[in-house]
Amino acid sequence: MVIVTNTSKITKGNGEKLIERFNKVGKVEFMEGFLGLEVLLTENTKDFDEVTVVTRWNTKDDFKNWTKSSAFRDAHSKREVPEYILENKISFYEVKVVRGPLTAAEAGNDSQAQAQ
């Protein structure tokens, strides 16, 4: 799994404007290899807002195919970069470990297995 983040520095008080743009179903949800999307607002920033859009993909090629698709062009072509976006940075992460919650019984079994 690959995670792609797009972190945007936003003029103070305008972070919600960018967040709202992602609060609807878009074309990315129909792309092969797309696993999910989260939009994060960084807390306690003093001089600016910071919004990070996190997308999860099966592979980096799946993400690249999205950026080369007509769906991507359609989703981005009619939009100029809003004045409130000061800068942004895209980062790629390869997921190496994924852990989920355990029930109490599972946690007990896991502890016993590790002790052996």
UniProtKB/Swiss-Prot annotation:
Gene3D superfamilies to which the protein is assigned, alphabetical: 3.30.70.100
Keywords of the record: Cytoplasm, Heme, Iron, Metal-binding, Monooxygenase, Oxidoreductase
Superkingdom field: Bacteria
EC number from the UniProt entry: 1.14.14.18
Residues at the site labelled Transition state stabilizer: 66
Keyword Metal-binding: yes
Protein residues bound to Fe cation: 6
Cellular compartment(s): Cytoplasm
Catalytic EC class: oxidoreductase
GO CC annotations on file: cytoplasm
Pfam families registered for this protein in UniProt: ABM (PF03992)
Domain (ABM): residue spans on this chain: 2-92
Binding site for heme: 76
GO BP: heme catabolic process; iron import into cell
Catalytic activity: heme b + 3 reduced [NADPH--hemoprotein reductase] + 3 O2 = biliverdin IXalpha + CO + Fe(2+) + 3 oxidized [NADPH--hemoprotein reductase] + 3 H2O + H(+)
An example molecular function term from Gene Ontology annotations: heme oxygenase (decyclizing) activity
Transmembrane domains' residue ranges: none
Assigned protein family: Belongs to the antibiotic biosynthesis monooxygenase family. Heme-degrading monooxygenase IsdG subfamily.
PANTHER family: HEME OXYGENASE (STAPHYLOBILIN-PRODUCING) 1, SIGNAL TRANSDUCTION PROTEIN TRAP
Subunit structure: Homodimer.
Protein's job: Allows bacterial pathogens to use the host heme as an iron source. Catalyzes the oxidative degradation of the heme macrocyclic porphyrin ring to the biliverdin in the presence of a suitable electron donor such as ascorbate or NADPH--cytochrome P450 reductase, with subsequent release of free iron.
Protein name: Heme-degrading monooxygenase
Organism: Halalkalibacterium halodurans (strain ATCC BAA-125 / DSM 18197 / FERM 7344 / JCM 9153 / C-125)
